[in-house]
């Protein structure tokens, strides 16, 4: 991977960050600097992409449609294929730890529909990903991977309404919304790092210019309106609070 995410802790001084930055450049990599937070930037935002794909599968949208729509939108790999490669079991471990951390603080973590589907794949259906022999895909020895046939039986719903535009927007907008939230929360401190990190760290389509540039390319008002439409249809993951809206405007570059 070209990108290296440098994590600044509460007591990390500027000299240490600068040394790390120079070292990463010397290695021929692309550095970005983010502040310490759960999932940092790239893992946190990448998670929204793959879990949105899983959520759509749970809604009854055919797996092949989801995967093909993602690639057609410019994403390098479909969300279900990525989950297989990174291991569904890893996502479930993260979910279990998140629940435990919230419980330790006296809170209850509300898992997304995508997370619950992945949990079912691992714990009930025993499909943990490529390393375990199969997840959303089967991996025949000496052959090309193919979608697990049981996905059709288990999840597809005849007559469910879907369109490619909504699928692609859900995959792209969900990541841009999370990026705006990271800016609002101070996890990210620049649009530059957001754009570089999203393209080289999580495969956000290069044609967009990055997750934040995607917002500015749509037009802020149009982006906010589309987010409201998606939130009304597909859930609060697309919601922009006042802080995120302010961050989008306050960080907008002046060219």
Where are these regions (language model features)?
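N-terminal glycine-rich phosphate-binding loop for ADP-containing cofactors
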Residues: 1-255
């Amino acid at each position: 991977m070209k990108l290296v995410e440098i994590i600044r802790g509460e007591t990390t001084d500027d000299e240490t960050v600068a040394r790390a930055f120079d070292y990463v450049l010397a290695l021929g990599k692309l550095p970005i600097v983010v502040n310490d937070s759960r999932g940092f930037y790239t893992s946190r935002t990448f998670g929204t992409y793959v879990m949105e794909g899983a959520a759509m599968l749970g809604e009854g949208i055919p797996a092949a449609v989801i995967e093909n729509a993602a690639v057609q939108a410019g994403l390098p790999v479909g969300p279900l294929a990525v989950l297989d490669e990174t291991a569904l079991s890893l996502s479930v471990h993260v979910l279990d730890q998140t629940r435990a951390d919230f419980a330790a603080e006296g809170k209850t973590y509300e898992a997304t529909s995508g997370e619950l589907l992945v949990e079912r794949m691992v714990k009930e259906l025993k499909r943990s990903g490529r390393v375990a022999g199969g997840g959303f895909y089967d991996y025949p020895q000496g052959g090309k991977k193919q979608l697990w046939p049981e996905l059709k039986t288990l999840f597809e719903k005849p007559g469910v309404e879907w369109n490619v535009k909504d699928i692609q927007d859900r995959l792209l907008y969900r990541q841009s919304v999370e990026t705006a939230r990271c800016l609002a929360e101070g996890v990210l401190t620049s649009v530059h790092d957001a754009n570089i990190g999203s393209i080289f760290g999580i495969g956000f389509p290069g044609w967009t210019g990055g997750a934040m540039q995607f917002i500015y390319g749509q037009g802020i008002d149009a982006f906010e309106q589309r987010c409201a439409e998606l939130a009304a249809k597909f859930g609060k993951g697309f919601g922009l609070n006042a802080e995120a809206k302010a961050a989008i405007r306050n960080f907008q570059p002046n060219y």
